[in-house]
């Protein structure tokens, strides 16, 4: 039996992978796990690997396609994954109850094993219970933190939830000027004592409120923990990670020597996207219209 408090199954699944549903990843190593005990996750994953997942989804009708290790349905639509899962539930004759919220999960005091699951409509006896509530990241899809209450009721110690795999909001009012830009770059996250907490590299997206993209997602949890501690982490963005600082300086000087009367805005054109270069100049208090000869 599945108890679902929303009016349909899979609302959160439909939002995964930007609506494409990457259902597993071929790159599964201990260092991919971001918690303190990598063995905890690693041992569990050995019982059902990425290859097992790909094979199982193929059996229920989902042809997989590989994008840099991310496994998507070949149709590139999360809806086909949801429909395949729903069809499998029907084949297995699994009873599904919609719009029925679980209120509590408790040990069955009348039996040596089993559980009593109480909902807003009824109660059920079960030998096994899988709590698949999600965290608190997407309340609109039903993840409102219920699972934490169920876990605490069984005596589990809870770690204060923090945001993860998310964009980072930056201070300042310049971000609207760079909104929409994507670059191949590297982000470094430091704590307020200038200690490096995390770094990652890949496609970075500039948005109106800050910075986003997979590299930012990967370091965001460390920023969230620092903010929970009332500390002030900061980001360093390398927008040209394939080039050294010395090489970039030489390029700027060479361009200035070639045409000292050109503006700074024109000087850095071709090195960076226009909007990003202008933001960098303004943050450094350099007038984009000033002449390049000033840097010689």
Go through the PLM ranges and name each one.
Residues 63-86, 154, 158-178:
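Rossmann-like dinucleotide-binding cores of NAD(P)H-dependent redox enzymes
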Residues 128-174:
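Glycine-rich loop(s) and the adjacent beta-strand/alpha-helix scaffold that form part
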Residues 18-68:
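Glycine-rich active-site loop/strand segments that organize a redox cofactor
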Residues 2, 15, 66, 96-98, ...:
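General beta-strand structural signal in soluble alpha/beta enzymes
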Residues 7-9, 14-15, 23-30, 157-160, ...:
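An anion/pyrophosphate-binding glycine-rich loop and adjacent beta-alpha core
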Residues 1-3, 102, 123-140, 151-152, ...:
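Short hydrophobic core segments
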